[in-house]
Curated annotation (Swiss-Prot):
The PprA protein combined with an immunofluorescence technique can be used to visualize radiation-induced DNA strand breaks in mammalian cultured cells, allowing the evaluation of DNA damage responses. This detection method could also be applicable to genotoxic tests in the environmental and pharmaceutical fields. Disruption phenotype: Cells lacking this gene show a reduced growth rate, do not exhibit a decrease in the efficiency of natural transformation, but are much more sensitive to ionizing radiation than the wild-type strain. One of its GO terms (molecular function) is damaged DNA binding. This is DNA repair protein PprA.
Length: 300
């Protein structure tokens, strides 16, 4: 028979190992959430916040704030819904939409994308047909500037439909309470963003014969398909596990409050700021995706 002291020590060690494993899994969930937010250019610091031993309420508030910021950049057109994220008792992070669970981070990024897909209503341009507000006046997108100025300066809750902007962008504006929201969008799905990045990678290949071969393959399989086909057999599956395969920056929302929210000049400045931010974020995304396609799909 084993000594009692050994049994006690052994049980203690097993308990410590189980706690360490659970902590590692939870830390991995926090890091995965931060990585998901990075696809929207959101500097989420949930892993660091959790490491500082912040309480559950503080973590839930930070999770929700990051998710709502990401919703303004993913361009899914779900502004009319309430978005929250919270910790679960078993160490996961649950994503909620209008109070109902949509997916858990542990289920993978694709699961969240699939949950959001039926909620969307995109037109042929990739723009949301949903109103940003549940209620309120909706003006046409081609509203004359003089009338738009009146709405911005005097109207209560309102929104406009999409109108064409510069550089293949689209724009709309809405007011909710004391806040004016200015959105600029350039629809580019995650797949399209990856294809753009694949083009950059192929264009940078110095081996011209190999480059020509990939261009030939792209006629059948597309840029991304050609590049993945030239990698190892698991490259496509590895890519599908990354958040970049499902989410990308397609829009930017700039907000104004107080007196600025009723100033037409401030609105025009916000429009320029949003357009510039969108241009920057989409450019950064393409460069980051190019690096992923070059180096980040190694065999595991």
């Amino acid at each position: 028979m084993l000594p009692l002291a050994f049994l006690i020590c052994s049980g203690h060690n097993k308990g410590s190992m189980a706690r360490a494993k659970a902590k590692d899994q939870t830390d991995g969930i926090y890091a995965a959430f931060d990585t998901l937010m990075s696809t929207a250019g959101v500097d989420s610091q949930i892993a660091a916040l959790a490491a500082s031993e912040a309480d559950a309420g503080t973590l839930d508030a930070a999770l929700t704030q990051s998710l709502q910021e990401a919703q303004g950049r993913w361009g899914l057109g779900l502004h009319h819904l309430r978005h929250e994220a919270r910790l679960t008792d078993d160490g996961d992070i649950e994503i909620l939409t209008d109070g109902r669970p949509s997916a858990r981070v542990s289920e993978g990024f694709g699961a969240l994308a699939q949950a959001y897909a039926p909620m969307q209503a995109l037109d042929e341009r990739g723009l949301s047909q949903w109103a940003a507000l549940g209620e309120g006046y909706r003006a046409p997108g081609d509203l004359p500037l003089a009338q738009l100025k009146v709405l911005i300066e005097h109207a209560r809750d309102f929104e406009t439909d999409w109108s064409a902007g510069r550089g293949e962008t689209f724009q709309r504006v809405w007011r909710k309470g004391d806040t004016l929201f200015v959105e600029v969008a350039r629809p580019a799905s995650a797949e399209a963003a990856l294809s753009d990045a694949a083009w950059d990678v192929i264009a940078s290949i110095k081996d011209r014969a190999f480059q020509r071969e990939l261009m030939r393959r792209s006629e059948k399989d597309g840029m991304l398909g050609a590049l993945l086909g030239a990698r190892h057999a698991g490259a496509k599956a590895n890519l599908a596990q990354l958040p970049e395969a499902h989410f990308t920056v397609q829009a930017f929302v700039q907000t104004l409050s107080g007196a600025a929210a009723r100033n037409a000049e401030e609105y025009r400045a916000a429009l320029k700021t949003a357009a510039a931010a969108l241009e920057e974020y989409q450019g950064v995304t393409t460069r980051q995706l190019s690096e992923v396609l070059r180096h980040g799909l190694r065999e595991s």
